């Protein structure tokens, strides 16, 4: 991508980006095209497919849960075309790295609402907690322990006692205790990974100022 086209894309994306400045957007665009290994050609949209994106989540942000990584991919891939384009990349990372608590609550709830019906059901909690907990070899029936954990979680978070979590239940619980934001699995970067990523990507502002 030539310098003029890069600058135009940077300007366009910066206008619609809440949490990154122009320099940071420019750095993330460059990183995106490095990751996809090419530029946009006539009639062909370049993007990160599910496997490439999951690799970034695993290597860069230390995520290991396949189910959660798939859900994070869907959270970024807003048009559901099977790949994350440059616009989705910038918007997704804006929330992923620097989103407000409100933005992160909406995002995490969507990740945890596996079937998209607007609720986190007991079954969904069970699947996510089963994936995220280490199995103890001494346990005869590890599923029983997970079922108990689901009940404990519901008791703490299900404010209207209907046996499932609505967004209102979840929001209230998280505002009371922010540790519950990622109650069903890590779907945001930890502070160390976030700082390392930003330090690595957002460097050499002089190069940008020369544009």
Swiss-Prot record:
One of its GO terms (molecular function) is calcium ion binding. One of its GO terms (cellular component) is cilium. It is found in: Cytoplasm, Cytoskeleton, Cilium axoneme; Cell projection, Cilium; Cell projection, Cilium, Flagellum. Its main location: cytoplasm. Strong expression in the respiratory epithelium. Expressed in the sperm. It comes from the Eukaryota. Component of the outer dynein arm-docking complex along with ODAD1, ODAD2, ODAD3 and ODAD4. It is linked to Ciliary dyskinesia, primary, 53: A form of primary ciliary dyskinesia, a disorder characterized by abnormalities of motile cilia. Respiratory infections leading to chronic inflammation and bronchiectasis are recurrent, due to defects in the respiratory cilia. Some patients exhibit randomization of left-right body asymmetry and situs inversus. Primary ciliary dyskinesia associated with situs inversus is referred to as Kartagener syndrome. CILD53 is an autosomal recessive form characterized by randomization of the left-right body asymmetry and respiratory symptoms. This is Calaxin. The gene is CLXN.
């Amino acid at each position: 991508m030539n310098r003029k086209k890069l600058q135009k894309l940077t300007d366009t994306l910066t206008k619609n980006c809440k949490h990154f400045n122009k320099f940071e957007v420019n750095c993330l665009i460059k990183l995106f095209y490095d990751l996809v290994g090419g530029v946009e050609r006539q009639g062909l949209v370049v993007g990160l497919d599910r496997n490439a994106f999951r690799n970034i989540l695993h290597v860069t942000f230390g995520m290991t849960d396949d189910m959660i990584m798939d859900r994070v991919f869907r959270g970024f891939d807003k048009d559901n075309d099977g790949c994350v384009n440059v616009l989705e990349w910038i918007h997704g990372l804006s929330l992923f790295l620097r989103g407000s608590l409100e933005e992160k609550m909406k995002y995490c709830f969507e990740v945890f609402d596996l079937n998209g019906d607007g609720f986190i059901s007991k079954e969904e909690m069970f699947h996510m907690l089963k994936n995220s907990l280490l199995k103890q070899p001494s346990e005869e029936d590890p599923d029983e322990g997970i079922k108990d954990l689901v009940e404990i979680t519901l008791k703490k978070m299900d404010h209207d006692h209907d046996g499932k979590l609505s967004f209102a239940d979840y929001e209230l619980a998280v505002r009371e205790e922010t540790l519950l934001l990622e109650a069903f699995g890590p779907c945001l970067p930890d502070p160390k990974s976030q700082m390392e990523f930003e330090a690595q990507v957002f460097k050499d502002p002089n190069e940008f100022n020369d544009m």
